[in-house]
A protein has these predicted regions:
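Positively charged n-region of N-terminal signal peptides that target proteins for export
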Residues: 1-9
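Bacterial N-terminal signal peptides
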Residues: 8-16
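Sec-dependent signal peptide cleavage junction
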Residues: 15-23
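Active-site- and interface-proximal helix/loop "cap" or "latch" segments in soluble metabolic
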Residues: 23-150
Length: 150
Protein backbone atom coordinates (compact mmCIF):
# COMPACT_ATOMS: atom_id res chain seq x y z
CA UNK A 1 0.00 0.00 0.00
CA UNK A 2 3.00 2.28 0.58
CA UNK A 3 3.68 2.50 -3.17
CA UNK A 4 0.03 3.14 -3.94
CA UNK A 5 -0.18 6.08 -1.54
CA UNK A 6 3.10 7.47 -2.89
CA UNK A 7 1.81 7.22 -6.48
CA UNK A 8 -1.43 9.02 -5.63
CA UNK A 9 0.41 11.78 -3.83
CA UNK A 10 2.94 12.23 -6.64
CA UNK A 11 0.27 12.28 -9.34
CA UNK A 12 -1.95 14.72 -7.49
CA UNK A 13 0.99 17.03 -6.80
CA UNK A 14 2.03 17.04 -10.46
CA UNK A 15 -1.50 17.43 -11.74
CA UNK A 16 -2.27 20.12 -9.18
CA UNK A 17 0.52 22.22 -10.67
CA UNK A 18 -1.02 22.24 -14.15
CA UNK A 19 -3.25 24.97 -15.50
CA UNK A 20 -6.94 24.74 -14.62
CA UNK A 21 -8.59 22.38 -17.08
CA UNK A 22 -11.93 20.62 -17.06
CA UNK A 23 -10.16 17.43 -15.95
CA UNK A 24 -6.47 16.58 -15.95
CA UNK A 25 -5.42 12.96 -16.24
CA UNK A 26 -2.33 11.22 -14.96
CA UNK A 27 -0.74 7.80 -14.86
CA UNK A 28 1.97 6.81 -12.40
CA UNK A 29 3.96 3.59 -12.43
CA UNK A 30 6.50 2.44 -9.85
CA UNK A 31 8.43 -0.80 -10.43
CA UNK A 32 10.59 -2.80 -8.05
CA UNK A 33 12.66 -5.99 -8.26
CA UNK A 34 13.12 -6.24 -4.49
CA UNK A 35 11.27 -9.58 -4.22
CA UNK A 36 13.62 -11.37 -6.64
CA UNK A 37 15.61 -14.35 -5.31
CA UNK A 38 19.01 -15.57 -6.49
CA UNK A 39 19.55 -19.20 -7.37
CA UNK A 40 21.58 -20.69 -4.51
CA UNK A 41 22.86 -24.09 -3.40
CA UNK A 42 21.42 -25.76 -6.50
CA UNK A 43 17.95 -24.31 -5.88
CA UNK A 44 16.12 -22.36 -8.54
CA UNK A 45 15.87 -18.59 -8.43
CA UNK A 46 13.07 -16.16 -9.17
CA UNK A 47 13.14 -12.82 -10.96
CA UNK A 48 10.15 -10.73 -9.91
CA UNK A 49 9.03 -7.31 -11.09
CA UNK A 50 6.26 -5.61 -9.13
CA UNK A 51 4.77 -2.68 -11.05
CA UNK A 52 2.29 -0.56 -9.11
CA UNK A 53 0.02 1.62 -11.25
CA UNK A 54 -2.25 4.54 -10.37
CA UNK A 55 -4.46 6.31 -12.89
CA UNK A 56 -6.41 9.35 -11.82
CA UNK A 57 -8.24 12.44 -12.95
CA UNK A 58 -8.20 15.78 -11.13
CA UNK A 59 -10.75 18.54 -11.72
CA UNK A 60 -10.10 22.27 -12.08
CA UNK A 61 -10.34 22.70 -8.30
CA UNK A 62 -7.62 20.12 -7.67
CA UNK A 63 -10.03 17.45 -6.43
CA UNK A 64 -9.56 13.85 -7.48
CA UNK A 65 -12.58 12.81 -9.56
CA UNK A 66 -11.42 9.32 -10.53
CA UNK A 67 -8.76 7.02 -9.12
CA UNK A 68 -7.76 3.45 -10.00
CA UNK A 69 -4.98 1.20 -8.64
CA UNK A 70 -3.47 -2.05 -9.85
CA UNK A 71 -0.28 -4.08 -9.52
CA UNK A 72 1.33 -6.41 -12.05
CA UNK A 73 3.41 -8.95 -10.15
CA UNK A 74 5.51 -10.69 -12.80
CA UNK A 75 7.42 -13.75 -11.56
CA UNK A 76 9.98 -15.54 -13.75
CA UNK A 77 11.57 -18.70 -12.38
CA UNK A 78 15.04 -19.74 -13.50
CA UNK A 79 17.29 -22.70 -12.78
CA UNK A 80 20.62 -22.58 -10.97
CA UNK A 81 22.19 -22.78 -14.45
CA UNK A 82 20.28 -19.67 -15.52
CA UNK A 83 17.66 -21.29 -17.78
CA UNK A 84 14.16 -19.83 -17.58
CA UNK A 85 11.77 -22.34 -15.98
CA UNK A 86 8.64 -20.20 -16.19
CA UNK A 87 6.06 -20.62 -18.95
CA UNK A 88 7.04 -17.85 -21.37
CA UNK A 89 3.57 -17.91 -22.95
CA UNK A 90 1.59 -17.71 -19.70
CA UNK A 91 -0.69 -14.72 -19.21
CA UNK A 92 0.36 -12.50 -16.32
CA UNK A 93 -2.79 -11.22 -14.62
CA UNK A 94 -2.76 -8.11 -12.47
CA UNK A 95 -3.99 -8.16 -8.88
CA UNK A 96 -7.24 -6.47 -9.98
CA UNK A 97 -7.73 -9.12 -12.69
CA UNK A 98 -7.04 -11.93 -10.20
CA UNK A 99 -9.55 -10.61 -7.66
CA UNK A 100 -10.25 -13.37 -5.09
CA UNK A 101 -7.74 -15.65 -6.83
CA UNK A 102 -4.88 -13.44 -5.59
CA UNK A 103 -5.41 -15.02 -2.17
CA UNK A 104 -4.77 -12.15 0.24
CA UNK A 105 -8.07 -12.46 2.11
CA UNK A 106 -6.74 -15.12 4.50
CA UNK A 107 -3.67 -13.04 5.38
CA UNK A 108 -5.65 -9.81 5.77
CA UNK A 109 -6.42 -8.71 9.30
CA UNK A 110 -9.68 -7.25 8.02
CA UNK A 111 -10.60 -10.18 5.77
CA UNK A 112 -10.42 -8.16 2.56
CA UNK A 113 -8.82 -9.18 -0.73
CA UNK A 114 -6.14 -6.95 -2.29
CA UNK A 115 -8.48 -5.52 -4.94
CA UNK A 116 -11.10 -4.66 -2.31
CA UNK A 117 -8.53 -2.75 -0.26
CA UNK A 118 -7.15 -0.95 -3.33
CA UNK A 119 -10.67 -0.03 -4.45
CA UNK A 120 -11.47 1.29 -0.96
CA UNK A 121 -8.34 3.47 -1.00
CA UNK A 122 -9.27 4.76 -4.47
CA UNK A 123 -12.79 5.57 -3.27
CA UNK A 124 -11.30 7.37 -0.24
CA UNK A 125 -9.21 9.58 -2.56
CA UNK A 126 -12.13 10.64 -4.79
CA UNK A 127 -13.45 14.07 -3.86
CA UNK A 128 -10.29 15.05 -1.99
CA UNK A 129 -7.37 17.29 -2.85
CA UNK A 130 -3.71 16.30 -2.55
CA UNK A 131 -3.54 18.03 0.82
CA UNK A 132 -6.62 16.19 2.10
CA UNK A 133 -5.27 12.80 1.02
CA UNK A 134 -1.89 13.49 2.65
CA UNK A 135 -3.53 14.67 5.87
CA UNK A 136 -5.83 11.65 5.99
CA UNK A 137 -3.22 8.92 5.53
CA UNK A 138 -0.80 8.81 8.46
CA UNK A 139 2.50 7.07 7.67
CA UNK A 140 5.70 6.21 9.49
CA UNK A 141 9.21 7.22 8.38
CA UNK A 142 9.33 4.30 5.91
CA UNK A 143 6.03 5.30 4.28
CA UNK A 144 3.91 2.52 5.78
CA UNK A 145 0.39 3.47 6.84
CA UNK A 146 0.01 3.65 10.61
CA UNK A 147 -3.78 4.00 10.76
CA UNK A 148 -6.47 1.34 10.64
CA UNK A 149 -6.89 -0.66 7.44
CA UNK A 150 -9.78 0.08 5.10
Amino acid sequence: MKKIVALVLALVMVLGCTAALADTYGLGISSSIGSSKDAADGADGKAQVDSTVCALAVDADGKIVSCLFDVAQTKIGFSAAGAITADKTAEVKSKQELGDDYGMRGASGIGKEWNEQADALAAYCVGKTYEEVVAGVAADEKGYATGADV
